[in-house]
Amino acid sequence: CLTDLKERFALCDIQPGAPLVPYRETIVRAEEMRPPANKELGRGAVVATTSSKQVTISLRVQPVPADVTEFLLKNADAIKRLYDRKAKVEESEGEEIAAETDVAAGNTLSVEDFKKQLKEKLESGKGRENWKDRIDKIVAFGPRRTGPNFLIDATADGIFSKAFAAENTTGAAPRAGESLHPSHLADKISYAFQLAAAQGPLCNEPLQGVAVFVEEVTLNLAEDDTSARDKLGRL
């Protein structure tokens, strides 16, 4: 390629630079760390309010164990099949057969085996009490829905639809006359997670090995005649 550029197109000397190596952003737990910004909330926790003051979100982030991150990276195809099956997206019969053939040949895990192995990796090991029974609380993987990061529903009411659930149970737009509920914001929060996982806070590089626990979503809406659907549009 460089020869063609020099001799046929540019007709001048070209100084090639060093190759660009992609990298990922992550968070780590170390023995010596700065004290948390808010001692009451603890490390990795934040309470954020929208500019309209109508929505407050409490969330916490923590590192995903290294072996779990590696497992997710190796099984991106299984995560993709999880979403495809959940959404019942079958573009063609041939693709469905090909996917099942890959599973039968051992090229990719079935959704059931993927969930089983992921649960074992999350819960086995020292200091992983916080991951117990979290497998059924996973809302999404990211970025691009197949990455090595988790969005986890840690709310008391379970406002999110779960990744391993058979179908979506929350997040639908409010019906006429229905009051706005935090679950109506679930898909918006999930989308925000995908954006944040795709562009990290330091260098806008994708995140890797980060779990986001959404602990509470609070609405503070003025009582008026505005419909819930209109309020959701403004939020």
Where are these regions (language model features)?
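Accessory interaction regions appended to the cores of large information-processing enzymes
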Residues: 1-235
